[in-house]
């Protein structure tokens, strides 16, 4: 069997590796002409996200992630108002990407290969690429992310729904923080919640993947409301005057918005978290959208990860959902050699998983950004793919 995976990010790599492991001949087609770097910051490293690297690649968790043992909340003065025991693991997009990609044969990963379309028959799918070449395969896995070309073609009525807020993000070297700040944030994911907003900070591996204290990065995610229209358009207009759709990458956020963000941090956030925000040199931002799909399987073609459901980050489960989709896909293909039948069986469970995760992250987001009833220590807020802590 031959398969093409469109999209060379974490979801696409999981799909390619797991299909490869059951004997499928797989090629990954990534539209970016350059190696994917700086495409993400910190990620919650749930068991599903780590499973392939631990079970199949034998990579020790402590080599690719940072463990924290506390969930901590600070008030405006920087005093601890909640400090509960709970173990999380955090990694970085780059660390996980490098580890997964190292498991795939280099000749199977094709940069600068954008899919322009496909034509399907009962027996195969012909994938068309921008280079005017084509590939004939038995299975097409579309893992092309939030702005999925495949989703737009297969489900043209599905549109991103703006959640009403944006995530400001950034990372700073742990070693650049003063001792008091490091102590306040030590061994924890640290939150501050205030009216219609919240921010969290946690340690992740350093730029070279180091997990040694002092060589790591401190990552923050700050959710801030922007009215659709002028306010949102303004913050998404980059330093070159271009209005972005989904995110503004590091180094491209307009200087006036960076200055405003730092000013609000200094005026409104607890000092330890504010110092992290102020020291970040190249903050970036992503718009928070909901995307829900009614289908994920279309004959010999499927949507996987963010190409299907796009969920808010509050469960730290976006990467885990893509990995779970990939594991289930490989298991379905291994059980059933008829690809359309396998995809039909695979689809029902993944649709249910995506729908419950989307609804749960909507509820969590509403609690902080709209209703103001986010309670520190509430077990419903624990990260997890299938439910709090699950």
Regions found by a protein language model. Name each.
Residues 1-2, 233-250, 258-263, 331, ...:
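Helical substrate-recognition/capping region of FAD-dependent monooxygenase/halogenase enzymes
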Residues 5-21, 25, 32, 141-142, ...:
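Conserved mid-domain beta->alpha element of the FAD-binding
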Residues 23, 68, 106-107, 137-138, ...:
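Short, well-ordered alpha-helix to beta-strand connector turns
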Residues 232-237, 272-283:
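Short acidic alpha-helical/loop segments enriched in Asp/Glu that coordinate divalent cations
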Residues 32-104, 368:
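Active-site-adjacent segment of FAD-dependent monooxygenases/related oxidoreductases
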Residues 4, 23-28, 32-38, 42-44, ...:
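FAD-dinucleotide binding site
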Residues 59, 79-80, 87, 98-258, ...:
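Conserved FAD-binding catalytic core of PHBH/FMO-like flavoproteins
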């Amino acid at each position: 069997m031959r398969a093409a995976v469109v999209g060379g990010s974490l979801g696409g790599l999981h799909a390619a590796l797991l299909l490869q492991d059951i004997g499928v001949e797989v090629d990954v087609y990534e539209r970016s002409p350059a190696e994917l770097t700086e495409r993400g910051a910190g990620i919650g490293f749930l068991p599903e996200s780590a499973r392939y690297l631990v079970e199949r690649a034998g990579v020790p968790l402590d080599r690719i992630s940072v463990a924290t043992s506390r969930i901590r909340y600070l008030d405006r003065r920087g005093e601890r108002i909640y400090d509960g025991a709970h173990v999380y693991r955090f990694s970085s997009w780059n660390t996980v990407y490098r580890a997964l990609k190292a498991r795939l044969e280099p000749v199977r990963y094709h940069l600068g290969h954008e899919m322009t379309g496909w034509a399907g028959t009962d027996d195969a799918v012909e994938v068309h690429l921008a280079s005017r070449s084509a590939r004939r395969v038995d299975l097409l896995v579309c893992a092309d992310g939030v702005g999925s070309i495949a989703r737009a073609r297969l489900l043209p009525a599905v549109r991103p729904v703006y959640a009403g807020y944006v995530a400001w993000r950034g990372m700073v070297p742990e070693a650049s923080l003063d001792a008091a700040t490091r102590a306040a944030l030590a061994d924890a994911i640290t939150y501050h919640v205030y009216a219609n907003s919240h921010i969290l900070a946690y340690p992740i591996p350093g730029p070279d993947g180091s997990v040694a204290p002092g060589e790591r990065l401190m990552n923050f995610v700050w959710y801030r409301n922007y009215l659709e229209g002028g306010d949102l358009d303004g913050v998404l207009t980059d330093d070159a005057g271009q209005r972005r759709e989904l995110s503004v990458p590091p180094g491209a956020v307009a200087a006036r918005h960076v200055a405003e963000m730092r000013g609000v941090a200094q005026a409104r956030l607890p000092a330890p978290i504010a110092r992290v925000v102020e020291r970040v040199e190249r903050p970036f931002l992503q718009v928070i959208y909901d995307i829900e799909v009614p289908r994920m399987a279309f004959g010999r073609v499927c949507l996987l990860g963010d190409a299907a459901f796009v969920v808010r980050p509050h469960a730290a489960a976006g990467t885990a959902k893509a990995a779970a989709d990939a594991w289930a896909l490989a298991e379905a293909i291994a059980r059933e050699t008829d690809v359309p039948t396998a995809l039909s069986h695979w689809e029902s469970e993944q649709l249910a998983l995506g729908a419950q995760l989307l609804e749960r992250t909507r509820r969590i987001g509403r609690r902080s950004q709209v209703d103001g009833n986010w309670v520190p220590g509430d077990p419903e807020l624990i990260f997890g793919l299938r439910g709090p802590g699950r």
